[in-house]
């Protein structure tokens, strides 16, 4: 673990500095982009400082890649935020990116440096197989966009899959939702990549129970949990909400379970250093 300091100023600016020589060294900077603006700016400054200190390789390890939901121009006069963040990281000086469960796989193509895209599936699969009886399990996705993810889990577990089809009024507000498939008497596992305000995931859970599901759990890689997410989870029919620790979750809910991906990240860093394959680290 290297030594560095961050100095904060009265006007809100900050400066970073390395407290030891990193000349000719391979530097791995571990920083999720949440909270988004400050963490991203700090990461960019760390990258720039490492480059100016003559580091050999600079790898940004970003378990949660913010702005990933802005991956396309889906209406007039909007930015493609994910592409901009990729450009900023590359311009700052990274030589590689390690990230996990991108909202859209194609974001890897926004970078001109190698991207190692990890998946939390191996960590989640171990937890599922140890804690959830598979004979009555159904995997569900809270929206059509997550069908590929849910299908991979269902296929790997050998269980059926159902889909929640939703229409939105606007961002973070769901207008209508219906189930495609049968959940009567089943233990449902909802899988997603990001839970922000928890509107979609909790409405999906309540709809599953309304349609006869025996129980509903949810599993997502990244806990953004903007207000009123914790309240919604607590008041919903979810029996458990499972996240990784890609983001810090401090608000607290008795229903929330955090599973660490520290070993997954550490092993990926080790394999980058030893030039080994990373794809074998995850189940799918």
Task: Name the predicted role of every residue range.
Residues 1-284:
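PRPP-associated nucleotide enzymes
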């Amino acid at each position: 673990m290297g030594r560095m300091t961050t100095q904060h100023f009265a006007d809100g600016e900050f400066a970073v500095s390395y407290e030891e020589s990193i000349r000719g060294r391979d530097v791995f900077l571990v920083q999720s982009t949440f909270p988004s603006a400050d963490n991203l700016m700090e990461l960019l400054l760390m990258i720039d400082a490492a480059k100016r200190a003559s580091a050999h390789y600079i790898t940004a390890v970003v378990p949660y890649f913010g702005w990933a939901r802005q991956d396309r121009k889906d209406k007039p006069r909007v930015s493609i935020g994910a592409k901009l963040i990729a450009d900023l990281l590359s311009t700052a000086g990274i030589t590689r990116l390690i990230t996990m469960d991108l909202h859209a796989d194609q974001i890897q193509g926004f970078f001109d440096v190698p991207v190692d895209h990890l998946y939390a599936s191996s960590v989640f699969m171990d937890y599922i197989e140890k804690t959830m009886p598979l004979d009555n399990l159904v995997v569900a996705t809270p929206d059509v966009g997550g069908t590929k993810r849910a299908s991979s889990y269902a296929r790997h577990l050998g269980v059926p899959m159902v889909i929640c089809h939703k229409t939105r009024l606007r961002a973070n507000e769901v207008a209508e939702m219906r189930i495609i498939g049968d959940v009567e008497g089943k233990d449902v596992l909802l899988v997603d990549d990001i839970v922000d305000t928890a509107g979609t995931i909790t409405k999906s859970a309540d709809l599953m129970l309304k349609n006869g599901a025996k129980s509903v759990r949810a599993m997502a890689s990244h806990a953004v949990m903007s207000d009123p997410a914790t309240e919604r989870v607590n008041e919903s029919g979810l029996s458990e909400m499972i996240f990784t620790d890609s983001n810090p979750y401090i608000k607290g809910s008795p229903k929330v379970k955090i599973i660490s991906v520290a070993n997954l990240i550490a092993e990926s860093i080790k394999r980058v250093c030893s030039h080994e394959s990373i794809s074998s680290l995850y189940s799918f």
